[in-house]
Amino acid sequence: MDEKTSKAASEKAKALAAALSQIEKQFGKGSIMRYGDNEVEHDIQVVSTGSLGLDIALGVGGLPRGRVVEIYGPESSGKTTLTLQVIAEMQKVGGTCAFVDAEHALDVQYASKLGVNLGDLLISQPDTGEQALEITDALVRSGSVDLIVIDSVAALVPKAEIEGEMGDALPGLQARLMSQALRKLTATIKRTNCMVIFINQIRMKIGVMFGNPETTTGGNALKFYSSVRLDIRRIGSIKKGDEVVGNETRVKVVKNKVAPPFKQAEFDIMYGAGISREGEIIDLGVAANVIEKSGAWYSYSGNRIGQGKDNVREYLKENRAMAIEIENKIRDNQGIVARAAEFAPTAEESAED
């Protein structure tokens, strides 16, 4: 490099340093930095979904913190159950959670059964969509809340609609409200490392002859701002004799900005108990050759652990150390660094203690 080129490079470096110094002085330390600096967070922080299969499908071991997440699906598909499981997982690692119940339909007894600590859960039941999003904005800006769930986008009714007459035509009002709110929220969410989960409902587009007629409420803004979008569906029923005791559920990762998308996970949601962790361990264990299956019999490390999935599920509930051992082997097989958390005691077991 000749002297002239060296001098020009030195001048450019000085000018850049002065510009960076001016930006930091005006907007605060950390407003701009080199990606190679240690201050920049290279690894994405995640929280488990409560479903081992879904954690694997997400590619990073859970839902990313400091991002917007959308969970949508038909009625009674398990949207709220999944988000309550995420709240329980966040509380397990010491996080503060808030539930903005715009639908005014949260079943606190059910939430408690899923492992949610109600004493530490912040709950808001706003009157209007604006109020719900202002509360969300205030909680995010506080920097002290780790997870906020909004249930649901469809219930975020603009104030003008509530104060208006039945039958008033107010096109695009909710979409504009969501667009404005997300423009405000996104930067703050990233800075405070708070995860915001929007639960959404499905509507049918009229006159669609070809392609998927389904769409979500609240316009397109949420689709763009979400880092992860999950489509959750009920695909079957779980029966014990003639009685239906749960749902077979499929979740598809429709959008993923932190790992490859379009993967899917299947798991069981048991009524009154949530996602069946043991059921997932059995299915994924067999797929990873950690558990051997011969006919109806299941074996682990050469020892038979039960005949039929229901019996093995009960066996793993009673032998939690074995269940955690199998789960960690599955995680190693899939390259997930995070270890299996201890099983939370059920409501009945807590009552016995």
UniProtKB/Swiss-Prot annotation:
Q: Name one GO cellular component term.
A: cytosol
The entry marks the following residues as binding ATP, namely 73-80
Subcellular location, record wording: Cytoplasm
A Pfam family of this chain: RecA
**GO BP annotations listed:** DNA recombination; DNA repair; SOS response
Listed GO molecular functions?
ATP binding; ATP hydrolysis activity; ATP-dependent DNA damage sensor activity; damaged DNA binding; single-stranded DNA binding
Main subcellular localisation: cytoplasm
Q: Where on the tree of life does the source sit, at the highest rank? A: Bacteria
- What keyword terms does UniProt attach to this protein? ATP-binding, Cytoplasm, DNA damage, DNA recombination, DNA repair, DNA-binding, Nucleotide-binding, SOS response
Indicate the family of this protein: Belongs to the RecA family.
Q: What does this gene product do?
A: Can catalyze the hydrolysis of ATP in the presence of single-stranded DNA, the ATP-dependent uptake of single-stranded DNA by duplex DNA, and the ATP-dependent hybridization of homologous single-stranded DNAs. It interacts with LexA causing its activation and leading to its autocatalytic cleavage.
**What protein am I looking at?**
Protein RecA
Q: Which organism is it from?
A: Bordetella avium (strain 197N)
Organism classification: Bacteria, Pseudomonadati, Pseudomonadota, Betaproteobacteria, Burkholderiales
